[in-house]
Structures are given as structure tokens and as C-alpha cells.
């Protein structure tokens, strides 16, 4: 039976064969997926997803409109559409 803190689903099991020939289970924290744009689904640049508690608020995402949700290209198109539509 594993230790209680390894029974969580936030750890993934890795079956490892040791040099002695025995096989054991090693536990490793799961890694988060990359952050993607809400419109075009491309990976976002400058957005951290793992171990967020180590970073300050400004390091976790860009400080601009829709930072961390929409990529710069989609934001550029969105701004153009709103400006052209309002005139």
C-alpha cells in the first residue's frame, strides 16, 4: 500500500525496473498542459502553467488586455474588428 499522500490522482504512477530485476512503482507529480489561445488554440507564449505558487502574479501571465487567454495575433484582429465596426 502506498503512503497516503501518494494515493492522490495528482501523482502519476511510473512502473520502473530496478537494476536488481525487481519492478517498483515511482510516483511523479503530473504536469499541466500548455495554455492555449481561446480562439485559435495555439500555445500561448509567456504563460507558465506548472508550479504557479513559485511565481508572482506578474510572472504568471502577460499584463495586457486578455493576457493569458488570447494570443497576440487574435487580440490584434479583435481590436481591428471592434475599431472598424464602431465607425
Curated annotation (Swiss-Prot):
Keyword Ribosomal protein: yes
TM stretches of this protein: none
InterPro entries listed in its UniProt record: Ribosomal_eL34, Ribosomal_eL34_C_sf, Ribosomal_eL34_CS, Ribosomal_L34e_arc-type
Superkingdom of this protein's organism: Archaea
Gene Ontology MF terms: structural constituent of ribosome
GO cellular component entries: ribonucleoprotein complex; ribosome
Keywords: Ribonucleoprotein, Ribosomal protein
GO biological process, one term: translation
PROSITE patterns: RIBOSOMAL_L34E
Family recorded in the similarity comment: Belongs to the eukaryotic ribosomal protein eL34 family.
Protein name stated in the entry: Large ribosomal subunit protein eL34
Species this protein is from: Sulfurisphaera tokodaii (strain DSM 16993 / JCM 10545 / NBRC 100140 / 7) (Sulfolobus tokodaii)
